[in-house]
């Protein structure tokens, strides 16, 4: 009933019949993850993440009413619901404070690529903490780990030559910094009007003021007075959802590229500074690009002297079976953002790489513009850099991208075998990243009623069986640790299938009640 109260509170604008149906549903199943979206706002529902079911912790060791203002969490949840508290990790698994074991199918937040117990990373952090726990990188002072990491990243990225690396603490900071760097670059070239950015609907580039503006998710804009006016959004390249009848993937990609060019011409090419894209869209629902998409988009932005920013925060370091997503899709970016797997998430760190053409301008024009007055106290933190250096060594020594190539076919095929389910609209993915979208009649135009919480039902069924997934409306996302074993892949597929069957049964009950 606690969850029901919160759900009813969050959906106060819905009809009374919807509220009654929702209350009946929650009390009858006890498994619904809180749906905080307004039932009348389909776009918000589609893009908003759903919390975990209430923890089984007792009142004594629970944390209901805790003092943390939690990210991407409705305020009432912190007060009314015990959070799921994770206490330790081991390989591809995490354990809650009650000792229950979960297969972590999202690798934390797309990030613990090497699992939760890699001793070499812990050793690297410990040794650096004893040697030099902190020093900054301002005013031409820095540390050996930051210099070594920059050198290693530049050598690892082979999609094209890159010139310099700038360190941040997260992917949000990386994309935020990209905007300031590009503005600085255009000011150095005497192009003060070339300042607009084009991103894509359903993209995710972070949650700071600027990176949230770049993101194309309504939940990141609503109630925050975003996006910023210098950010434009173009089409989402989701073929299943947005293609026209009879339109092939290549034709769809051509239409989107043409739409992008029309937007550029409408705004004026002299005002557009950069285009930013994830090689595979992550938080927007795991959306791989349609065939020829990046080939056509790159040609358009190059034609109008617009920089291409590859947001590799999720796709870098083996996730797709290549070291970088740019390798997979033949992207030749001018700038690259990365974070997450850079340290396997053991220590916060992010980075951006810039092409020689951009770094040369920053160098040559520095006497005119002065210093690049941007950075963070913890930019190039020596402990974070030491851990990241060790992570990069492991990715290469163990050939993690090749391991992903070997186990990902079973991961993809095993889950996609359930695509025939009557409640599944589409299952999509590449490498070790995969999304499931629930829909009625297998049509993107027939979503299930929001108050049913189909995605939330599936997430709760997975959690009950010992697997954590990400739920966002009726989208399910999985991005497991890159070290997964074949047996763990089989476990994932098995739990997915069992949870899907239970969800199908619940949807059938809801349909029956609706029709009676």
Curated annotation (Swiss-Prot):
Keywords annotated in UniProt: Aminotransferase, Mitochondrion, Pyridoxal phosphate, Transferase, Transit peptide
Positions bound to substrate: 204, 340
Catalyzed reactions: 4-aminobutanoate + pyruvate = succinate semialdehyde + L-alanine; 4-aminobutanoate + glyoxylate = succinate semialdehyde + glycine
Region (Disordered): 45-64
Residues engaged in binding pyridoxal 5'-phosphate: 171-172, 311
Polar residues: bias regions: 45-60
Transit peptide: 1-47
Keyword S-adenosyl-L-methionine: no
Record has Protease as a keyword: no
GO cellular component: mitochondrion
InterPro entries registered for this protein in UniProt: Aminotrans_3, Aminotrans_3_PPA_site, PyrdxlP-dep_Trfase, PyrdxlP-dep_Trfase_major, PyrdxlP-dep_Trfase_small
Positions of modified residues (N6-(pyridoxal phosphate)lysine): 340
GO biological process: biotin biosynthetic process; gamma-aminobutyric acid metabolic process
An MF annotation (GO) of this entry: pyridoxal phosphate binding
Function: Transaminase that degrades gamma-amino butyric acid (GABA) and uses pyruvate as amino-group acceptor, but not 2-oxoglutarate.
Name of protein: Gamma-aminobutyrate transaminase 1, mitochondrial
Lineage start: Eukaryota, Viridiplantae, Streptophyta, Embryophyta, Tracheophyta
């Amino acid at each position: 009933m606690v969850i029901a109260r919160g759900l009813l509170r969050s959906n106060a604008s819905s009809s009374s019949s919807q509220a009654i149906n929702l209350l009946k549903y929650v009390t009858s199943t006890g498994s619904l993850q809180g749906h905080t979206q307004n039932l009348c706002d389909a776009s918000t529902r589609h893009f908003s993440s759903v919390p975990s079911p209430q923890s089984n912790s007792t009142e004594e060791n629970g944390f209901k009413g805790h003092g943390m203002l939690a990210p991407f969490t409705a305020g009432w949840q912190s007060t009314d619901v015990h959070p799921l508290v994770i206490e330790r990790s081991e390989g591809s698994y995490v354990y809650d404070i009650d000792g229950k074991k979960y297969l972590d199918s999202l690798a934390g937040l797309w990030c613990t690529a090497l699992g939760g117990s890699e001793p070499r990373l812990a050793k690297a952090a410990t040794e650096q903490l004893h040697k030099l726990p902190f020093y900054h990188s301002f005013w031409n002072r820095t540390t050996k780990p930051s210099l070594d990491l920059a050198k290693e990243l530049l050598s690892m990225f082979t999609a094209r030559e890159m010139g310099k690396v700038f360190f941040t603490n997260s992917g949000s900071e990386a994309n935020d910094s990209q905007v300031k760097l590009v503005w600085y670059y255009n000011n150095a070239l005497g192009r003060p009007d070339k300042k607009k950015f084009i991103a894509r609907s359903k993209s995710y580039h972070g949650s700071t003021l600027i990176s949230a503006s770049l993101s194309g998710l309504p939940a990141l804009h609503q109630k925050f007075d975003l996006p910023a006016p210098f950010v434009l959004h173009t089409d989402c390249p989701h073929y299943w959802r947005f293609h026209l009848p009879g339109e092939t993937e290549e034709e769809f990609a051509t239409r989107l590229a043409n739409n992008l060019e029309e937007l550029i011409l409408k705004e004026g090419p002299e005002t557009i500074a950069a285009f930013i894209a994830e090689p595979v869209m992550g938080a927007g629902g795991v959306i791989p690009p349609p065939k020829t998409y990046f080939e056509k988009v790159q040609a358009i932005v190059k034609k109008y002297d617009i920089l291409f920013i590859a947001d590799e925060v999720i796709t870098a370091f083996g996730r797709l079976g290549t070291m970088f997503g740019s390798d997979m899709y033949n992207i030749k970016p001018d700038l690259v953002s990365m974070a997450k797997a850079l340290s396997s998430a053991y220590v916060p760190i992010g980075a951006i790489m810039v092409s020689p053409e951009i770094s040369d301008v920053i160098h040559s024009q520095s006497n005119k513009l002065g210093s690049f007055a941007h950075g963070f106290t913890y930019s190039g933190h020596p402990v974070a850099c030491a851990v990241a250096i060790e992570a990069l060594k492991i990715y290469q020594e163990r050939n993690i991208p090749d391991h992903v190539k070997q186990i990902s076919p079973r991961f993809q095929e095993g889950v996609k075998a359930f695509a025939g389910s009557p409640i599944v609209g589409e299952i999509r993915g590449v490498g070790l990243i995969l999304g499931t979208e629930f829909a009625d009649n297998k049509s993107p135009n027939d979503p299930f009623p929001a108050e049913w919480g189909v995605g939330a039902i599936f997430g709760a069924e997975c959690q009950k069986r010992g697997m954590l997934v990400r739920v966002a409306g009726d989208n399910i996302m999985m991005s497991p640790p890159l070290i997964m074993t074949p047996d763990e892949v089989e476990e994932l597929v098995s739990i997915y299938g069992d949870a899907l069957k239970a969800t199908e049964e619940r949807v059938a009950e809801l349909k029956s009640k609706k029709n009676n």
